[in-house]
């Protein structure tokens, strides 16, 4: 059975919380976005010393990737899918025509989950999605900005 993750859907804004992401190496109290390299996802597990964003709650596993969107039409690392513990996480950006560029985070998982994208300290969340369904989070804002894409498992 093959499954495909769609790259588009609607997401609603959620409250802004702390930015997240970094290598998990018993670094209690680190700022989670410190040291993120654009296009390189970091996966965390509960108790690894990096606190997830408040919106994610206390997930067993969560991931973050920094996506730098510039005004070029070229899309290095524009769309990527990664196999993670409970499913397939896809993230990246695509053209939204005259509206700018859309940053997205989609996730198909065998457990309850959600996806979120963060731009300018505002979170756009898919909300909780049941197992074996795909979550979709995205935002379209201009031609050049930095976006953080997240997924998490219940």
Where are these regions (language model features)?
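N-terminal prepro-regions of secreted/extracellular proteins
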Residues: 1-83
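Mature secreted bioactive peptide module from preproproteins
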Residues: 68-154
